[in-house]
Amino acid sequence: MCSSDLEQLLGYVANRAHHAELGGISPGSMPPLAKSLAEEGVVIPPTFLYRGSKARFGEIEKLLTAKPYPSRSPEDNLADLKAQAAANLLGTQALQRLAATHGAGTVADYMGQIRQRAADAIARRITTLEPGRHTATERLDDGTQLKATIEVGDGKIRIDFTGTDALHSGNFNATPAIVQSAVIYVVRLLVNEPVPLNEGLMEHVEITLPRCLLNPEFPDDPAQAPPVVGGNVETSQRLVNLLLKPFGIVAASQGTMNNLIFGNERCSYYETIGGGTGAGPGFDGADAVHSHMTNTAITDPEVLEWRFPVRLERFAIRKNSGGQGEFTGGNGIVREMVFTEPVSLSLLTQNRTQGPYGLNGGQAGHPGEQHLAKRNGQEIELASVAQQELEASDRLIIKTPGGGGWGEIN
């Protein structure tokens, strides 16, 4: 964007939003068993939403409704895009007013100072870290390995993901953007100062990211490209626990977003569910909260039951699920719901086969659990990644992981 007199380029105004339905092979556009990017929903290449101040929503609608897996709610997508465009316009006007009041040069100078403040903060923090080289591994529930070697020295933090397994057969593949998001988040935790999030935090951080499930190749044809939705919401969480482990500042948090998606031809619903956070030196973990790579609020029970074919019967803290230690990990959540009409259910979760790790002698948190109680009396234990067709009166029970404990129990 430019200053109001169009004489100086000031920067960009941008926003990012989740669109809960973008097509794909199952309602909610998060199919747990997708084998290609195309099966996860409509793939839109870089496209102008406005051109010369003229909206192009007709062209966008054609892309949203394109075969083979069109959006089930294109009208919602278009409304959300209009809201995002309005937010950008508001941001543009605010920045232009700032430049008009104080001068474009002054605004640019302060932007530079904010970035430099972040760079200085991580530089100071690096001087307090013990120089050396540490390697950590984490395994997804299916055994897939994530590996990072972190080296501190010469005023730098170097992170090398060599040794991470190759392309994932499912949708737990990530992208360099996801990896960088996890890294900058961990760097911000290390800094532990009220520094605005900006690129300056990465000034003294180097990332080596070979071809692997964190950096796969993407052919032009979406039907041949790897799926990534699990990488975005689940691998990202496990990456944070992986990167925190060598620094030893906190035990593992739940390491999952507990993605729950259900829908049918008339509706689609998606939520993420909190859990326990890890304990650390001098503090217990928090109960029943979101952590790390997600901060979404959950739908109010009244709204959930009014708009969707489901009855929420229990939403409670999962007692004693945090890892024991001198300081105890936070407890997870129990969420139980009964469906009132047939729906397609998808679950995309982690830490069901193992609990989030403890540190310094602390115990791991309890793994998550999930199962169905069918109306015919049958009980079905559900895997970390699951898809089921449900009938009216079927009951779903989800128990999310607790956080890891810190320190040996005295």
Which residues does each PLM region occupy?
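Glycine/proline-enriched, intrinsically flexible loops and inter-domain linkers
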Residues: 1-410
